[in-house]
């Protein structure tokens, strides 16, 4: 019996973590990839992601080592007071290209990205993902496409350590702990989505 393998784009946020656990529970061999592009929040985000990987590895033997890849970022996204319309040009194509290249080198035929497709960005919709799929020689899986964040949490968070996830563009480190700012758009989206678990 052949074993399914997948490269999962894993940033340690809600969607990518729920997706990681989804494939682990389905007994896929999961190869997590974190892509660095030089953004201000990445050092703490990656530190938190590595801790989450270690926590998860103790529970799932089918979780492979976390691979950190680096891509060029010609223009840094500056810290902003108002980040509601924060858009990182070509972000998804860069992520998919990096993960796709890694998958091909490993002989893996599938990569997975946790895009929801609900944001009004040109590279964040089902049609774009289909066109992107046609450019690479691996299958691009988008299991949460068309879903809201709270729907992902409600449907796929069982057994997922949501308290260990991080979705923030201004995280801080205090007393050895990484703390989200609580006010950026990513934090607000996360807080709003988590409220649905209490309804």
Question: Model-flagged regions — what are they?
Answer:
Residues 2-199:
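Nucleotide-activated chemistry modules centered on ATP-dependent adenylation/adenylyltransferase
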């Amino acid at each position: 019996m052949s074993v399914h393998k997948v490269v999962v784009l894993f940033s340690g946020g809600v969607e990518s973590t729920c997706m990681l656990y989804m494939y682990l529970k389905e007994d896929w061999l999961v190869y997590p990839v974190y892509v660095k592009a030089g953004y201000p929040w990445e050092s703490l985000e990656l530190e938190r992601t590595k801790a989450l990987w270690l926590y998860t590895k103790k529970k799932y033997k089918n979780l492979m080592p976390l691979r950190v890849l680096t891509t060029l970022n010609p223009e840094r996204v500056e810290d902003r007071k108002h980040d509601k319309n924060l858009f990182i040009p070509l972000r998804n194509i860069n992520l998919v290209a990096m993960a796709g290249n890694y998958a091909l080198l490993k002989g893996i035929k599938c990569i997975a990205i946790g895009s929801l497709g609900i944001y009004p960005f040109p590279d964040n919709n089902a049609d774009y993902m289909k066109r992107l799929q046609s450019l690479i020689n691996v299958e691009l899986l988008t299991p949460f496409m068309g879903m809201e964040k709270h729907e992902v949490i409600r449907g796929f968070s069982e057994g997922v350590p949501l308290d260990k996830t991080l979705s923030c563009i201004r995280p801080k480190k205090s007393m050895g702990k990484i703390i989200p700012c609580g006010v950026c758009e990513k934090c607000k989206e996360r807080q709003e989505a988590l409220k649905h678990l209490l309804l």
